[in-house]
């Protein structure tokens, strides 16, 4: 779902850029992270006065899912466990994390983990599916739009 969401966001951005040459669109955004593309789609929709509220709502729903998306791509998923009658799985992130302590000292750590229950994952995936459906509707609408 996440790759399809990112693909649709890219297509919508390309349409909002509205270049005569599709390759120019591609070169402008091909290296962008999801975070950069979310900011860009908001700016472009505002600039084009196209579905600003709708796009802003999609972005605000998608931002909380970024950690889960990053976990799927970069995370180290551990074995499934049962805790308090719930099926759980932990995902570790082995990238360096920088945090500030209460005394404003920067602390470094390499390992961060997040606990997910199957219920948590189901809920997140339902949200991702809803976002995907909204992006598909938006793509259908924008594909018929002519700005000039």
Report each predicted region and the residues it spans.
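Acidic, Ser/Thr/Gly/Pro-rich intrinsically disordered interaction regions
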Residues: 11-148
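N-terminal signal-anchor transmembrane alpha helix
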Residues: 6-10
